[in-house]
Amino acid sequence: MNTSSPTRSPQSSPSPNPQSTLSHRPSPRQPQSSDTPPNSSANAPIPDDEHGADLPMNMTASVMLTNLPRDAHQALADVESIDSGKVTVRFQPLPSAPILKNRVFKVSASQKFETVVKFLRKKLDCKDTDSVFCYVNSVFAPGLDEGMGGLWRCFKTDDQLIVAYSMTPAFG
């Protein structure tokens, strides 16, 4: 006999009686005998709460604020002011890329990186079939839907966003 395993007494073991076991299937209905009253506690429905049930509310029915707290209002104002100005972009050619006469341009911070790529393609007189590969700080190629304000805030060098460009893939 293993002493580490608990011994089971008949009272603690599950009952083999199918009427008392729990199952995910409902037990078949048995005809009601004539000696049990129709409103016995076994057949009675579950009563509703006396205080009434709370109905679930969606977000549109939740509490509406008439004005924002002071710190939230200031945070929103700060975010709006970030993308309202212009950012400086410096184009840096990689080897074998054509060189621009003017390398520094200003672009609205609310513009997407796609706008910068289109502008660069126009300045380089690229055909529709030509490829232009752009890299921020010669490290990564941002997505075309990235905001210029966010890129400038995170990756600026001397208050300029350095965009290296090449006609062939330069990095990985």
From Swiss-Prot:
<keyword id="KW-1017">Isopeptide bond</keyword>
<dbReference type="GO" id="GO:0061723">
    <property type="term" value="P:glycophagy"/>
</dbReference>
<keyword id="KW-0653">Protein transport</keyword>
<dbReference type="GO" id="GO:0015031">
    <property type="term" value="P:protein transport"/>
</dbReference>
<keyword id="KW-0833">Ubl conjugation pathway</keyword>
<dbReference type="GO" id="GO:0034274">
    <property type="term" value="C:Atg12-Atg5-Atg16 complex"/>
</dbReference>
<dbReference type="InterPro" id="IPR007242">
    <property type="entry name" value="Atg12"/>
</dbReference>
<feature type="compositionally biased region" description="Low complexity">
    <location>
        <begin position="1"/>
        <end position="21"/>
    </location>
</feature>
<comment type="subunit">
    <text>Forms a conjugate with atg5.</text>
</comment>
<keyword id="KW-0472">Membrane</keyword>
<dbReference type="GO" id="GO:0019776">
    <property type="term" value="F:Atg8-family ligase activity"/>
</dbReference>
<dbReference type="GO" id="GO:0034727">
    <property type="term" value="P:piecemeal microautophagy of the nucleus"/>
</dbReference>
<dbReference type="GO" id="GO:0000422">
    <property type="term" value="P:autophagy of mitochondrion"/>
</dbReference>
<comment type="function">
    <text>Ubiquitin-like protein involved in cytoplasm to vacuole transport (Cvt), autophagy vesicles formation, mitophagy, and nucleophagy. Conjugation with atg5 through a ubiquitin-like conjugating system involving also atg7 as an E1-like activating enzyme and atg10 as an E2-like conjugating enzyme, is essential for its function. The atg12-atg5 conjugate functions as an E3-like enzyme which is required for lipidation of atg8 and atg8 association to the vesicle membranes.</text>
</comment>
<dbReference type="GO" id="GO:0000045">
    <property type="term" value="P:autophagosome assembly"/>
</dbReference>
<protein>
    <recommendedName>
        <fullName>Ubiquitin-like protein ATG12</fullName>
    </recommendedName>
</protein>
<dbReference type="Pfam" id="PF04110">
    <property type="entry name" value="APG12"/>
</dbReference>
<keyword id="KW-0813">Transport</keyword>
<comment type="similarity">
    <text>Belongs to the ATG12 family.</text>
</comment>
<keyword id="KW-0072">Autophagy</keyword>
<dbReference type="GO" id="GO:0000421">
    <property type="term" value="C:autophagosome membrane"/>
</dbReference>
<dbReference type="GO" id="GO:0034045">
    <property type="term" value="C:phagophore assembly site membrane"/>
</dbReference>
<dbReference type="GO" id="GO:0097352">
    <property type="term" value="P:autophagosome maturation"/>
</dbReference>
<dbReference type="InterPro" id="IPR029071">
    <property type="entry name" value="Ubiquitin-like_domsf"/>
</dbReference>
<feature type="region of interest" description="Disordered">
    <location>
        <begin position="1"/>
        <end position="55"/>
    </location>
</feature>
<feature type="cross-link" description="Glycyl lysine isopeptide (Gly-Lys) (interchain with K-153 in atg5)">
    <location>
        <position position="172"/>
    </location>
</feature>
